[in-house]
Amino acid sequence: MGVMDGLWRWLGVEREEVREEIIELPAYSEENQRGPTNVVSIHSNKTFKVVVCEPESFDEVQVLADHLKSRKQLILNFDNTPPEVSQRIIDFISGTTYSLEGHSQQLGKNIFIFTPSNVEIAKDHRSLMRKHGFANPFGGEK
């Protein structure tokens, strides 16, 4: 589980049963613009939320789907969920993600990320982790 702990730290998320985190992006400021330039500021006042959840039953899928509809990212950990329940939840949330034109990817054996359409997932996560120093932190298999 050491590699996943590194991934969680890289994502800036501490492992908890359910955790919502607000990431504040810096707002545009006139003070940042000194003199005439051709640079256009792309900062916005939007906040993005990441919901980390360890679902225990299929009854939670509506709440999870509502998070996606609200444009929140979901990280689902199925380590303590029965396999048949996990598969049903993954199927439901995958359908929700598809209908919202979102994205999904498996991060680990039982860990998945689902994002709304405004958030893309880098497909080559291993090279990103190597770039940021998180690949193979404990000397295990590459």
From Swiss-Prot:
Tell me the protein's name.
Cell division protein SepF
Which Gene Ontology CC terms are recorded? cytoplasm
Cellular compartments annotated: Cytoplasm
Example of a GO biological process term: FtsZ-dependent cytokinesis
In terms of InterPro entries, this protein maps to: Cell_div_SepF, Cell_div_SepF/SepF-rel, SepF-like_sf
Assembly behavior: Homodimer. Interacts with FtsZ.
Q: Which HAMAP family match?
A: SepF
Q: What does this protein do?
A: Cell division protein that is part of the divisome complex and is recruited early to the Z-ring. Probably stimulates Z-ring formation, perhaps through the cross-linking of FtsZ protofilaments. Its function overlaps with FtsA.
Its keywords, alphabetically, are: Cell cycle, Cell division, Cytoplasm, Septation
Q: Which family does it belong to?
A: Belongs to the SepF family.
Q: Which domain of life does this protein belong to?
A: Bacteria
Which species is this record about?
A: Syntrophomonas wolfei subsp. wolfei (strain DSM 2245B / Goettingen)
Q: What is its main location?
A: cytoplasm
